Curated annotation (Swiss-Prot):
Transmembrane segments: none annotated. Residues 67-180 form the sHSP domain. Pfam families: HSP20 (PF00011). One of its GO terms (molecular function) is unfolded protein binding. This is Heat shock protein beta-11. Expressed specifically in the rostral-most somites at 24 hpf. At 48 hpf, expression continues in the rostral-most somites and also in the notochord. Somite expression was restricted to the vicinity of the horizontal myoseptum. In adults, expressed in the heart. It comes from the Eukaryota. The gene is hspb11. One of its GO terms (biological process) is response to heat. Gene3D superfamilies: 2.60.40.790. Residues 184-205 are annotated as: Disordered. Keywords: Stress response. It comes from Danio rerio. Induction: By heat shock in the somites. One of its GO terms (cellular component) is cytoplasm.
């Protein structure tokens, strides 16, 4: 019977020293290798995040390209009339809501403004914003008190009214005449009988 040691090569201590030695279980890795793997994982996450942000920015830019804002500045029609003894100004504001209108009185001037914004969809995935804005200024007549101006909104018509007070400034005025009754002088009253007696005596002669 052959001995198993017969088939095993004879290894000297010097030959064992040159063979690589590693542990098969449990598996161990150098610390630098783990650090490198961690860095690679972080870099990959950063790359994914950058690609996501790039796609997000591109989507935002595409949405902006689909929106084409259009702003229109134009005055609105108005009618200035006189209703009896009132100053009346009517503006066509049917395209504006009450919250989109403003009326200010500065001295003897009226400043009327409005701004509206509406979204319009063309049915093809694109839409636009239609903006309309106006600013108009009016002078109040001299016979209108600025403090008495009032405005109202009725059926899309902005109505501004104020009572007329007439011509308050005039170069002509009536000056009343004041008088007191005349008082006779007492000395003159005492000399009247003497004068009458002298006149009577002269008539007899």
């Amino acid at each position: 019977m052959l001995c198993p040691s017969t088939f095993q090569p004879h290894l000297s201590p010097f030959m064992d020293f040159h063979w690589p030695v590693r542990s098969l279980w449990p598996e161990t890795r150098p610390l630098f290798f783990q650090f490198e793997q961690e860095m690679m994982r972080h870099m990959q996450e950063m790359r994914h995040n950058m690609e996501f942000m790039e796609r997000l920015h591109q989507r935002i830019f595409d949405e902006i390209d689909h929106v084409s804002p259009m702003t229109t500045f134009k005055p609105i029609s108005f009618q200035l009339g006189k209703e009896g003894s009132h100053y009346a100004l009517t503006l066509d504001t049917q395209d504006f809501s009450p919250e989109e209108l403003a009326v200010k009185q500065v001295g003897r001037k009226l400043r009327v403004s409005g701004k509206t914004e509406k979204k319009q969809d063309d049915g093809k995935g694109s839409y636009s914003y239609r903006c309309q804005e106006f600013r108009q200024e009016f002078d109040l007549p001299e016979d209108v008190n600025p403090e008495s101006v009032s405005c109202s909104l009725n059926n899309g018509q902005l109505q501004i009214q104020a009572p007329r007070e007439g011509n308050t400034v005039s170069n002509e005025r009536v000056i009343p005449i004041t008088y007191t009754p005349a008082v006779k002088n007492p000395a003159l009253q005492n000399s009247e009988p003497e004068n009458q007696a002298v006149e009577a005596e002269a008539a007899e002669n």
